[in-house]
Amino acid sequence: STPIKSSAASDVYKRQLYFRTDHHWTALAAYYSYVQFCKVAGMEPAALEDFTELDMGPFLGSFYGNCSQSSKLREDNVLAYDPPGDITMTITKDNGSAFEWPVLTDMSKSSIYAKYMTFLGGDHPLVTITNNDLPDGPNCVVIKDSFGNPFAPYLSQNYHNVYVIDYRKYNAMTLSYFVQYYDIDDVLLTESLAMAQGEGTLDLLEWFCK
């Protein structure tokens, strides 16, 4: 396995990679990590210009609510990048019910605190992004916490199916079974360092990665 470090991209791109008021990275940072992954995997990354930039407006994240000096923090702005092509997405809940949902949700008129829900509609046990223009393309699975939400849509340009699993919520099968059942070619882990260090998180990952 090969780790992909967002710091490798930050040496080249001097734009905002993390929100000021939130613990998440921006969609731009996720794109740069996607580019780094493609280089390692021997794939051609899609150009950012191929995506449609969407402005979801001002955003106040988790740091804002937890900071005693929150009034001094400047608002962030959430930008999202809609992938081109015939892209569909299905959300599967923990009770097995499934429904279609847009890859990017228009949260421009929603609460200033909810804008990160733009990406994949938030956190769900299983999300399947399908590029119907690549019927013979490979399949990948992204094991993630919420950091994976803005990252996964970019992969739709290189894979037929992108399966996105939130290991904190998914318990239908272990990774080894999932890889066999869905004919997975590549496995990616996208997670924040803070979550990776939590004991409960490691227990969940240990179970899922059997």
Specify the residue positions occupied by each region the protein language model found.
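Extracellular/periplasmic envelope-modification machinery, especially enzymes
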Residues: H23-N139, K144-Y177, Y181-D185, L189-K210
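Alpha-helical hydrophobic/aromatic positions enriched in membrane-embedded helices and signal peptides
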Residues: P3, Y18, D136-G137
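Lumenal/extracellular "mature" regions of secretory-pathway glycan-modifying transferases
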Residues: S10-D22
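Single conserved hydrophobic/aromatic residue that forms the stacking wall/gate
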Residues: S1-A9, Y13
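Alpha-helix N-cap/helix-initiation motif
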Residues: T2, D22-H23
